[in-house]
Amino acid sequence: MVNLMRKFAKSIGRPGTEFWRGEDMISALPDHLLCHILIFLSTDESVLTSVLSSRWRNLWKWVPRLDLNTSDFPYPNDVTCAAFIDKFLNLYNESYLREFKLRIDQANFRSNVSLYEPCLGVVIKKPNVRHFQVESDLLEHWCTSEIRLTLSACQALVCLKLHLVWLNDFESLSLPCLKIMYLEDVVFPSDAAAETLISCSPVLEDLKLSLHRDDVVVVLRVYSQSLKSFTLKRAVPVYAINGAHTVLVDTPRLVYMSLIDYQFKSFKIISMSDYVKVDLDVDFELMRDELSERNIVYDLLNNFSGVRNMTISWTTLKFIHRFHDMNPLPKFRDLTRLRATMSSDASLEVLRIVLESCPKLKHFHFTLELVNDFPEAVITGFSRVLPRCLVFSLESVEMESPITEKATELKLVRYFLENSATLKKLVLLLNHESTGEKHEPGVLKQLIESPRRSSLCQFEVLAVPPNPEPWWIYVKPQRFL
């Protein structure tokens, strides 16, 4: 309870010790301010304040926000939580609730999530609900039961976040105020339903989609005149059986796009902003036809030939290298800023491919990783023909690397120092703890003092800060919600 009161004190700008010395200043505030303070607590914490005094007994009931975790309710969790929601909704008129958040604990495989469907249907229809969020604490492939939801016209809804929810079909839908929509492992009933959900949101700005393994959408159409940020994530590759085969994107105001675990056969961008930033972490491992795979990779990348800012993962670069001789990488003719990750063993060859594809590159940040997934023989040196960007445009390079057995990182530094005519800054970030390897004495000093093609180039060697979390610490898989 003390911690709760300290939260209150902090929310009004008074230190906890000062709060406890004097009179109860918080309780003297008017009801609407106290309710505003309680908004920053979960509903479970808010209910606890009812025992502070008679002044607080019923205040939690007037907070226009429900933030619930089913694990906080006594067994059977789903029965008691659903009953609590029903009782709360019946206490007040329909214009009261503004925000609803429900986290469903399915760790108990006896959970009955269908109990929530009636009350969720009531909440989503409330005329003044601005934030609606339903999520499960399990990963997609551990989910054993379905949470079904029917969307309807939601005139005030600004933020919609759903995780592991099966959407029922709908004939019409209107979301005139919706700006944020995160749908993670959500199953659409049809192509038309997915398209309608996006197109009926005329002010939508931020869209994140993670397709479920059971999704039946064949053609995913993302048509929006207002969308600014779009993230598309595929189901875990092992489970990617069904789902979209074609993606069409028509988003003229889009300034950020991220593709993760890509498994689509066709991806076409009709329109997007000239200043869009693209993050690519795509994977094609389920395909067996090399010709089709090669064309799909090329067609996907060709969509981004005009972007100016890009981040690309080693997963994607590995496929680019694999088919480079048969189908060269498209020219990223306007790309000036690039972040990339690559295998240290393949970096000498892959770096050449990347630089040759970016004739106007100015700023390059790349990370070397120690991965054993590159069985092909690779070159041990560079071509004498210099990429155009080294001669005319490259201004800054930042490389993060472990100390490798073959000192690959030093070879790359020498390459940039000796060949970059316009380079102004080169930074080598060394991770001294990852491999246990050490450079020969004096080698870094020699490198710092070595001649450079660009007289303006400043070269620095910095240590990567140690990771505060040991490798055995469990890291929760990245989620949208």
Swiss-Prot record:
One of its GO terms (cellular component) is chloroplast. Residues 378-430 form the FBD domain. This is F-box/FBD/LRR-repeat protein At5g18770. Keywords: Leucine-rich repeat, Repeat. SMART domains: FBD. LRR repeats lie at residues 126-153, 159-185, 186-211, 214-234, 236-261, 289-314, 340-368. PANTHER family: F-BOX/RNI SUPERFAMILY PROTEIN-RELATED, PROTEIN WITH RNI-LIKE_FBD-LIKE DOMAIN. Residues 23-69 form the F-box domain. It comes from the Eukaryota. The keyword Secreted does not apply.
